[in-house]
Each structure stands twice: as structure tokens, then as C-alpha cells.
Amino acid sequence: MKVTVDFEECLKDSPRFRAALEEVEGDVAELELKLDKLVKLCIAMIDTGKAFCLANKQFMNGIRDLAQYSCKDALVETNLTKFSDTLQEMINYHNILFDQTQRSIKAQLQTFVKEDIKKFKDAKKQFEKVSEEKENALVKNAQVQRNKQHEVEEATNILTATRKCFRHIALDYVLQINVLQSKRRSEILKSMLSFMYAHLTFFHQGYDLFSELGPYMKDLGAQLDQLAVDAAKEKRDMEQKHSTIQQKDYSGDDTKLEYNVDAANGIVMEGYLFKRASNAFKTWNRRWFSIQNNQLVYQKKFKDNPTVVVEDLRLCTVKHCEDIERRFCFEVVSPTKSCMLQADSEKLRQAWIKAVQTSIATAYREKGDESEKQEKKSSPSTGSLESGSETKEKLLKGESALQRVQCIPGNAACCDCGLADPRWASINLGITLCIECSGIHRSLGVHFSKVRSLTLDSWEPELLKLMCELGNDVINRIYEAKLEKMGVKKPQPGSQRQEKEMYIKAKYVERKFVEKQPAAAVSPLESRTKVLPQSQEEKRHSAPEKSFLAIEQGAASPRVRSSDSGIQQSVDDSREHLASTISANSLYEPEGEKQESSVFYDSRQLNPGLHLYRAAFEKNLPDMAEALAHGAEVNWVNMEENKATPLIQAVRGGSLVTCEFLLQNGANVNIRDMKGRGPLHHATVLGHTGQVCLFLKRGANQHATDEDGKDPLSIAVEAANADIVTLLRLARMNEEMRESEGLYGQPGDEIYQDIFRDFSQMASNNPEKLNRFQQSDSQKP
């Protein structure tokens, strides 16, 4: 309620003035009580809100812990992390709201009470004091006798001075009242308006935040619906399988009895057996036994290192034991000791005895073949299928994938945080990672990083060789080029996961630390290729190589290149022979005088796609990684070179590792050039057996025909390349077998898998054995 005190009434000091003062003073006292109460309620609200934010933050930490626990499930980890980050932003918005509430309500209203109302109270005290003095002066003036002239003058002077002081203080008091009445409205409304604007900002920020999250939540909902459908289908399948298993007759043994001498994981047979201890009590303990790598080993728990019972099965024998009380026993005897074992049934005992005997025979056979294979290794006419067992033996006895990869410069520590002894790798980037950073990489998606264990997963030879061609030092020189310049601190092994995650996303997803390429000083069309005229003599000599992008030998990049070779050609002789071979196949004929040799600019002047295209031919893996970091499209098409792709260029360059690198980074194995030839066509024409094997394993379409109506098989038959013909026919036969067996057929014939595995091993470790096509022709007069 607004009450205005009139200045005229103030001078009169009338009863109306006194009544107005009394009303104003009561109103101000009530206002003070209301404001004090509101401030206390505001403080309680802010404290409660901060407690809510603290509890909410603890809840967010719980979600993050759950996300970290689910690091092996990319869907759960990614979504929980994103949701926790969003809710953390809402907590921040709540804290901002409470801070603004404290400033707008608590601070402003407390200031009004402590300053403005306090001034009113001080003015009231002075007014009451001078009013009392005036009343005393009036009473004294009235009591003075007429005949006492001296007292009359003194009383009159005091009364005059008191009235003058009263009027001055009364006017100040009235002014303070009117100012307070006017100011309180603006102060109260201003604080409330500021409070409401704080809420407006809070809800607006929340709306914007969840508007961005909306499509993501919608996509997740669709994924959950699909997961529910898949879960229902899996449940039905499991119930059906459960019913089928229940209907089977398990009156006999319920343990798998098969053994496989050529198992991919090297384990011939495994299962539980009782083992008699060698102590004085001869106790029997149940352990998990396995036959692997020509050894008999056992372990109690999976995390325990296997205990070797027999180091070399060739030095032992196995026999039945019928002279002891326990049933189903057999004994494995070596020159130094014997081991008494017991199976659960007679069938299992016979299976184990047969598995040990077969493993002994296999070990002797492999040992006997070693000398013959060593002799055949030096012969140029050695069959391509003869070295498969040798290669497998070499890998079994050689260094492990972990040892080979970690010996590359920089690979002994995590590429992103520096933790020692990393046991995970990103195979498309070519780096080693610790387990925490590998979980973050896995959350990025396979289009950014493909994570694999160096100790738990199997490694194909071409992939292992790719890891040895790159390494942390090479990749960090590309992806951390501007790290010091930008002043960014690299995470340490002890850094928080959130800090590592932000750094890894900035490094590989946003590529913030990659050195930007300077703008080329040529037009976009000219930046693709620069054509230089050549003499007729130069054209004649370079004609066979025009399809290879015809890069001059002197223009080779000085940077590090892959040591991999798919064709084992020398600098001069093999190129000349290869050109004549290609001409004989009539698939790479010159297209008249229009084709000319192309010379590239420095890589800094190339667009990323052309940079990748050039580096793929030159077998320059660091340059290829740099081009991808600069945004090169892995399936970039060079319109000036018959729509060839980097993968086709890698085939022409003759590097198996380069092809593997492009495939790991998403290269399409079936994209064809202007003449209808894909990578498989080009590899077949050039006689690159290892590349043909790689492309077939990656799903290359061998039925596709080029503009001449030739598929890869007809090209290989025409060129009389026995190895490639064998691979193509085996792949086609395996494909037909799978189609005939239907959905539940076997994934592939064992012979097919063994042969392709042998070819992969030879292409990576002994490529010279796959070059019979070139070698036999070069020996012709």
C-alpha cells in the first residue's frame, strides 16, 4: 500500500500528520517482516537446490560408472555417456539459476532492508527525539511567569530554535518516507523480474539442449524397438533349441568328442580330466586339459597360465591303465615322468587316447617335412601350396603379435595417453592403445577406429604387417602436428576418462590437431593432375605404364614407403617384363596419342583425394594416413585416369599392405573403373596372387565382367596363371557349395580355408613364392 505524507501537514504538525506517520510506520514495519521472511525462504530454497544438484551430480557419476563398466557394449556405453553429459549440463543450468536467484532475490532485497529501511528507522528516531524536545519547549514556554522577563526571553528563544529544528528534521523524515514508498515498488518488482528472467533463461537453455538430443533419442528408441524384436526372436530360437536338446538322448556321454588336428586356434582337443597328483597322498584333482602346439597342458582357472604336462608329444606315449581301481584311466608317459589321467567315460578315454596318438603322428610328420621344405624354398618353381605348413610353423615359433607390434617405434606406450605396455590396437589407424583408450576408441564407431586385442584376437598376416608399417610415432606426427602450437596438454596415464575422451574425440573425430593443408596455387581441375608433354621416344618407352598413372621414377616421394611388395619386381627388369606381359593380355593398351605421362605436384599442393591416390601407387603408407587425416575420400575417383580409385592404384603399385590399409579404412572392393575393371580384375591381370587372395576374402565379385566381357577367371586362364586360377575356382566352388547348402550350411570347406590361409601367409611372409608367373616368363629366351 502506498501512503504519501503531505509536506504542508508536516509543517503544521497536525493530528492528520501524526496519523499518517503512524500508518506509514506500521506499514514499513510489516513490509520489513515480509521481506525478511522472503529472504529466509529464498536462502532455504537455494540451499535445498544446491543439495539437489549435489545429489544429482552423484547420480550422474553413477551413470558414468555404469557406462565405463559397459565399455565392451558400445551401444550402452555411448548412450549412457551422452545422456550423462546432457544431464550434467542440466545440473550446470540449475546451478546458474540458483546463483541468479541469490543475486536477484536475496542480495537485492537484503540490500533494500539493510540500507533503505534502516535509513527510515534512523530518521524516525531523530524525528521522535526532536518532537519530544519541541513538546518540552512548549510546556516550559507556557509555564514562564509574566513578571520574569529574563526567563520569558530565554523560553521564547528555546522554543523558536526547537521549532526550527523540528521543521527541518520533520521535512527530512517526510522526504525519507516518500522516497521509501516510491523505491520499494521498483526494488521488489525489479528483483522479481530478474528472478523470472533467470527462469526463462534456464528453461530456454534446457529446451535447446533437449532439442538437439531429440533426434538422437528418437534413433535410440528405434534401435530399442529393433532390439526388442531381435530379443524376442532370439528367445524363440533358444526355446526351440532348448526343446530340441531336451528331446535328445543323453543317456551316454554329454561331452563333445570331436578333435581337430588342424584347428585354427591350435587346440586339437580340450576338456575336463582327473589328474593324479605326484605327492605322497596321490590325490585326484579335476583340471581342464588341452592338446595344443604339440603339447599337453592343463589349467585350473581360465586366468591361470597353463601348466605344461608334456612339452613335446613326439617324446611320449599313451596307454590304457587297467591295473588300478579307478575306471577310465590312461597314462601319458614321457622320458622324464608319467601322468595318470582319468576320463568321465570309456568313450571320452578312447577319444583322448586317439587325440594324443594323432597329435604325436602329426608332430612327427611336420618335423620330417621341415628339411624338404627348406630345400624347396630356394627353388623358383616351388608350388604355391607347399609352404602353408611351413609358414604356420614359423608363426607358431616366431614372435607373438604383441611383441612384433610393440617393437615398432612409439608402440611400446599408448598412442593417446602414454601408458606403457599397451595390449590393444586400432587396426585402421595402425596404433597401439591401453585398455581404457581402446574403450573410448570403440565408442567412436568402426568408421573412426577399429579396435582389436593384441593378445586375445587372431591376427591375419597382412594385418599384422600393416601394423608394423605404421606405428604411434608416424600417426602422432600427423594427428598431433599442431598440439604444441595450440598449447594443448596431452592426457597422461592417470588422467580422468572424461579428459581422455575429450582429447581422443578432438584428435580423431574433429581432427583439431592435424596441420591444415595450404591452399593450392592452381585451379581445382589443375590440382588433380599436371600433364607435361613428352617426346615420341619418351611416349614409346612410357606407353606400357600409362595405366599405372605413369609417375616418373625420378618423381618418387622421398618419404618412408612400405617395404611390402606384391610382385617382387626390380627397378628396371621387372617393369619391362610386366609391361610386355600386360601388352600380351591386351587389357592395358595405350589409348592413342591422347594419353600422356602425368607428373604430380608436391603433396602439399594436392587435394586430399589425389594425395591418397598418388600415395597408394607409391606404397607410401604415412602419406596415405595423412591424406585420410585431411579428409580424403577412401573411394575417391580420378576422372582423369579412367575413374580409377586409390585401391586400384594400390594394386598397380603392387603392395598387399597398401590394399589392406585401404580396405580397413572402408575402401569398396567392387568399385570399377571406366573400363569396368575392379581391383580384382587389375590384380589378376598383373599376376598379384596375394592381392587376389585378399580381395576374394573381402567379398570381391569375381563374376563381374569388364567392357570386353572378361571376368577375372577368364583373364587368369588366358594368362596361364595357375595360382590365381586355383584361387578363383576354389572361391567360386565354395560359393556354389554355400548356396546349395542354404542358410544353415557350413561357412566354407576346410580345404578352401586352408588354401586361402596358406596363400595369405605366403603373400605376407614369402611373396617370392607367388611369382611363378613372372619368373617362368622371365626365363624364356
Curated annotation (Swiss-Prot):
It is a peripheral membrane protein. Pfam families: Ank_2, ArfGap, BAR_3, PH. Its main location: membrane. It comes from the Eukaryota. InterPro entries: ACAP1/2/3-like, AH/BAR_dom_sf, Ankyrin_rpt, Ankyrin_rpt-contain_sf, ARFGAP/RecO, ArfGAP_dom, ArfGAP_dom_sf, BAR_dom. PANTHER family: ARF-GAP WITH COILED-COIL, ANK REPEAT AND PH DOMAIN-CONTAINING PROTEIN 2 (PTHR23180:SF241), CENTAURIN/ARF (PTHR23180). GO terms for biological process: cellular response to nerve growth factor stimulus; endocytic recycling. Residues 379-388 have a biased composition (Low complexity). SMART domains: ANK (SM00248), ArfGap (SM00105), PH (SM00233). Residues 365-378 have a biased composition (Basic and acidic residues). A zinc finger (C4-type) spans 414-437. This is Arf-GAP with coiled-coil, ANK repeat and PH domain-containing protein 2. Residues 399-521 form the Arf-GAP domain. GTPase-activating protein (GAP) for ADP ribosylation factor 6 (ARF6). The lineage of its organism: Eukaryota, Metazoa, Chordata, Craniata, Vertebrata. GO terms for molecular function: GTPase activator activity; zinc ion binding. Residues 266-361 form the PH domain. GO terms for cellular component: endosome membrane; plasma membrane. Residues 365-390, 520-576 are annotated as: Disordered. GAP activity stimulated by phosphatidylinositol 4,5-bisphosphate (PIP2) and phosphatidic acid. It is found in: Endosome membrane; Cell membrane. PROSITE patterns: ANK_REP_REGION (PS50297), ANK_REPEAT (PS50088), ARFGAP (PS50115), PH_DOMAIN (PS50003). The gene is ACAP2.
